[in-house]
Amino acid sequence: MFAKIALVGRPNVGKSTLFNRLIRSNRAITHDMPGVTRDRMEGIVRGRNKRPFGIIDTGGITLDGHAAVAEGPAGIRGFEAEILRQAEEAIAECVAVCLVVDGREGLLPFDEHLASYLRRTGKPVLVVVNKVDGIEKEDVLTAEFHILGFPVLAVSAEHGHNLRWLESEMRDLLPEEDEDGIDDDAADATAVAIADADAETEDGASASETEEDITEETVEDEPEAPLRLCMLGRPNAGKSSLVNALTGTNRMIVSDVAGTTRDSVDVAFEKDGLSYTFVDTAGVRRRSRITDTVERYSVNSSLKSTTKAHVTLLVLDAVEGITSQDKRLIELLDERKTPFMVLVNKMDLVPAKAREDGKRNFRDLLNFCQHVPLLFVSAKTGYELRSIVPLAARIRRECSVRIPTGQLNRAMEEVITRHQPPVVRRVRPKFYYMTQAESQPPTFVLFVNDADRIQAPYAKYIEKSLRRLFGIEHAPMRVHFRSSHKKNSEK
């Protein structure tokens, strides 16, 4: 594993903008409002013929109203303490730290407390004075930061000033004993989960794209790649708690406050010798209830993450039941043919006598997409958590199924012989042959004399038969009917 460097500092000093600039991607949400970043995010800094290294963006370390500024990190209380804990864990993983400060605001008491705190860690520290927009301002805006006793470098994350110099200085902080010619390919092999996330850009798939566009942009068929699982759901459904429980860590900040998670955060872990990555996302609410820009960015990032995952885990609240927003998310994933499963979390809060009725209600409400697995789980007690990853791995395998044309046509003959298509307008549809057009998800095309005569119930019968014959139980599936004498006529 290659070395990492942490970005640490007060809220709104530009850490996330700097993070995005260094990894050359827009992964971290940035906004003028302080405290946007909460959970730590990881990325890779690359350069042509340069040694790659990891960086960790941490949440802004601040004090709440119950602590005095003079207390420094030891005085942090409440929700902000979780952000500090995340930063402490990031620092422990890293070989060095960049203390990011705001050159426009100047040196503040809390910058000094953070510097003292970082000095006690024994890690090399570089003070990065951000928001310095030109060389003519460097001496004036950086002078007072030399009192901290660390090397100082002025940059502008927004305008790109001195960023190449910063990369060079950060590489100089890496331990010499690790410099053994690690190239980009080796870095990708050791951190494929982070690398996949870094590949996301602003022009990724959006909710308005067509099914075909989204299919082309989903994960390619790469059996060796670690299984990538995206957590999706309404705010406070327990997505972060599930990630922590499944990975056996406190990687994600968890609180009773809805909307705690804002960025889409990758959490890599290993189990039974295999590598996996969970992508924890911000809660998705109805557009009419989204009142600020940060939440809008978070929701867009959450939906985009589903197109970059092998399987999406849609988390519902067992106590609240299926809401209208849950139904919209299910319908959206089903329409897009996104591989997904439904996790009904917080089963520990449902009275024992009401559990069976509750499970029955969930199954009835999800009857319109019967292929989607439904698991009842509890992040708090661990109930049924061990079933999630194996089932997700099965869905991924089913999405990669490829069936030879000859085998498909023998199956089609058997299916049609068993149940002939109904006569429509005094003509019975005649089937010629079938082929698999693609996988991810499995897509089949049946050529008939007149596709317009294939009715929805019979199309459903064909799909169910294909699932039964070829063991495609939970993966999404597309079945198209094409007229042999009508070009581009599909149903």
Curated annotation (Swiss-Prot):
Residues engaged in binding GTP 2: 233-240, 280-284, 345-348
Subunit structure: Associates with the 50S ribosomal subunit.
Protein name: GTPase Der
Keyword Mitochondrion: no
Domain KH-like as annotated: residue spans: 401-485
Record field: compositional bias (Acidic residues): 198-224
Residue ranges annotated for the EngA-type G domain, each copy included: 3-178, 227-400
Family indicated by similarity: Belongs to the TRAFAC class TrmE-Era-EngA-EngB-Septin-like GTPase superfamily. EngA (Der) GTPase family.
InterPro entries xrefs: G_ENGA (IPR031166), GTP-bd (IPR006073), GTPase_Der (IPR016484), KH_dom-like (IPR032859), KH_dom-like_a/b (IPR015946), P-loop_NTPase (IPR027417), Small_GTP-bd (IPR005225)
Positions bound to GTP 1: 9-16, 57-61, 130-133
